[in-house]
Amino acid sequence: MLTIKDIENFKETFNDETPLGEPQHWIYLKSGRSLEITHEENGIPESKQYFSIRLHCSEEEFNNGDYYKTCGVITTLTATTAQDTLNCINAIMRTFKEMED
């Protein structure tokens, strides 16, 4: 799982990037779902940049049409600090009873 230090150093520790070049990290969960953490920065002044944390449904849930209208996104939270980002990740994991794969 990500630590505060990982989030603070996101440019070095995140394992992917968006098509817009924004740092992104994926956490794959035992349920088949995934957690996407993106540093939203493209076209945003540095003082207003933030992290988005999205829980994506599993392939099976998507194929069943469960989250088709939301493009597979179950929930989204946003945060501006590393601590708030970690709190959002933990809140999603607790609320949806998820475990890292």
Language-model region placement:
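Negatively charged, low-complexity tracts enriched in Asp/Glu with abundant Ser/Thr
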Residues: 1-34, 65
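Hydrophobic beta-strand residues in large extracellular and virion-surface proteins
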Residues: 7-10, 25-27, 35-37, 51-55, ...
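Detector for Asparagine
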Residues: 9, 15, 42, 63-64, ...
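Intrinsic disorder/low-complexity segments
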Residues: 12, 32, 42, 94-97
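A short, structured beta-strand/loop element
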Residues: 34-65
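Mixed-charge, Lys/Arg-enriched low-complexity segments
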Residues: 58-101
